[in-house]
From Swiss-Prot:
Belongs to the V-ATPase D subunit family. PANTHER family: V-TYPE ATP SYNTHASE SUBUNIT D. GO terms for molecular function: ATP binding; proton-transporting ATP synthase activity, rotational mechanism; proton-transporting ATPase activity, rotational mechanism. It comes from Clostridium botulinum (strain ATCC 19397 / Type A). Produces ATP from ADP in the presence of a proton gradient across the membrane. HAMAP family: ATP_synth_D_arch (MF_00271). Signal peptide: none annotated. Keywords: ATP synthesis, Hydrogen ion transport, Ion transport, Transport. This is V-type ATP synthase subunit D. Disulfide bonds: none annotated. Gene3D superfamilies: 1.10.287.3240.
Length: 216
């Protein structure tokens, strides 16, 4: 559907400039969409690998906790993990990837106490299974934070891909065709007007020549 504009040469010039800009914008957005998709696929692959690793390690830790709960009384188990020996602070920054602000987690871990042990208990009344569970959880934290970062990045990039896709489609299937159709229409009208003008001038010339001929 063409735009509702006056079929003038000035309007034609404006529309041609708009078409050039729209075509250039479409190419840039399409390139951005392709690059976003390439990075998104890489992020999804990384996310799946991280998730598998995290789930596997969490499963191992939970199994050790179950084994520990089987050989320890609930009171001793609860007391053993009631006072964590580690404090964690997380600083959230942002990294710009193709106009997408992806979160970056910078976390600092500090063990309490002089010995710097990760275990919040003595070993007299605890089991080796509980030690293993605590050790696994301690080691899995960096992967958990990385997984949170990657999953959030995937979500944000998916949103940006969808927004870019809508803009690409709007240009490709609406704006550019409208401009092309309108330019074609105006050009046709201008050509018609030019032909009419030429025909009228030729007719006037013929009439003037005929008048001069009759006067001789």
């Amino acid at each position: 559907m063409k735009l509702n504009v006056n079929p003038t040469r000035m309007e034609l010039t404006k529309l041609k400039k708009r078409l050039t800009t729209a075509t250039r914008g479409h190419k840039l957005l399409k390139d951005k969409q392709d690059e976003l998709m390439r990075r998104f696929i890489g992020m999804i692959k990384k996310n799946n690998e991280l998730r598998k690793d995290v789930e596997k390690e969490l499963e191992g830790s939970f199994k050790d906790f179950l084994m520990a709960s089987a050989v320890m009384s609930p009171e001793f188990l609860e007391e053993a993990v009631a006072y964590p020996k580690e404090s964690i602070s997380v600083d959230v920054k942002k990294q710009n990837i193709m106009s997408v602000n992806v979160p970056v987690f910078d976390f600092k871990r500090k063990l309490e106490g002089d010995k710097g042990s990760i275990f919040p208990y003595g070993f007299a009344n605890t089991s080796a299974e509980l030690d293993g569970a605590i050790e696994k959880l301690y080691g899995i934290l960096p992967k958990l934070l990385e997984l949170a970062k990657v999953e959030k990045a995937c979500q944000l990039m998916a949103d940006e891909i969808e927004k870019t896709r809508r803009r690409v489609n709007a240009l490709e299937y609406m704006t550019i065709p409208q401009l092309e159709e309108t330019i074609k229409f105006i050009q046709m009208k201008l050509d018609e007007n030019e032909r009419s003008t030429v025909t009228r001038l030729m007719k006037i010339k013929s009439m003037m020549e005929e008048k001069q001929s009759n006067m001789v």
